[in-house]
């Protein structure tokens, strides 16, 4: 027997994939260069030459048995160390390699995070518009997804509507800034208000409500805009593919508030 909730999930269609299929079909008719495809985040510029050169060097000079073998579960210590050092330089943090969890794509990292901070029967609150795949990541873990309606004037958080969705069964709040698909980055004021609300609400219900911050587009901001750095009880995710034309990978960083880097 196949689980009904999985049959329901597999039977539903992704709007993003549908748009991609329509774009491909239309491109075959009039030429793909004449179609503006805003569905999948595929590269639209060449890969950096340094990245290509590094890959070619590895293929030419590294033992193929070692090169094509499995990496450690959390990936190579040298890669995690490099990510930690980059974050420390940019944001004044004190991360070590033990704070970094690498996955193939942000999907795996998000799924891990939901299972880490929540149990079946709890809920996760996010904000519309949102990446549709959040739904199977969360519901697949046995949690309910609650969606806060958008504040269409500026796509910052509608805190009145948001507060009505958070209760004693809320395990986490999931944000995506800069947002896919609106492009809006939450302001420092919005994030501070969110932090204050979650701190007060966690105290009210007697358990932590974690903030999961999905940030694949952190590097894609314009006109001097800044994306504030979120801290405290936060699991942050970075995807290389979201900001540069390279194969997808993701970084999961533990919350500074957790007692051990292994948590």
How should each PLM-predicted stretch be described?
Residues 6-11, 182, 245-246:
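Glycine-rich "substrate-gating" loop/helix at the edge of Rossmann-like oxidoreductase active sites
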Residues 38, 173, 214, 256-257:
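Structural scaffold positions in well-ordered secondary structure
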């Amino acid at each position: 027997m196949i689980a009904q909730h999985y049959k329901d999930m597999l039977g539903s269609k992704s709007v993003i994939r549908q748009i991609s299929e329509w774009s491909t079909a239309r491109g075959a008719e009039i030429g793909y260069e004449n179609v503006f495809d805003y569905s999948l985040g595929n590269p639209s510029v060449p890969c950096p030459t340094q990245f290509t050169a590094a890959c070619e060097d590895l293929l030419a000079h590294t033992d193929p048995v070692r090169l094509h073998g499995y990496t450690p579960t959390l990936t190579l210590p040298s890669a995690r160390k490099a990510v930690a050092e980059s974050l420390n330089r940019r944001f004044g943090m004190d991360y070590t390699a033990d704070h970094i969890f690498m996955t193939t794509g942000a999907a795996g990292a998000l799924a891990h995070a939901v299972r880490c901070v929540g149990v079946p029967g709890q809920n996760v609150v996010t904000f519309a518009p949102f990446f549709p795949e959040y739904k199977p990541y969360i519901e697949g873990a046995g949690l309910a997804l609650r969606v806060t309606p958008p504040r269409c004037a500026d796509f910052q958080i509608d805190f009145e509507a948001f507060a009505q969705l958070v209760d004693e069964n809320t395990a986490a709040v999931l944000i995506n800034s800069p947002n896919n698909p609106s492009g809006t980055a939450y302001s420092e004021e919005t994030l501070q208000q969110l932090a204050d609300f979650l701190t007060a609400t966690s105290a009210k219900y007697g358990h932590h409500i974690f903030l999961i911050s999905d940030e694949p587009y952190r590097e894609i901001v314009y006109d001097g805009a800044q994306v504030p750095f979120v801290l405290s009880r936060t699991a942050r995710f970075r995807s290389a593919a979201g900001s540069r034309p390279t194969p997808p990978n993701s970084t999961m960083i533990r919350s500074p508030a957790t007692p051990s880097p292994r948590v």
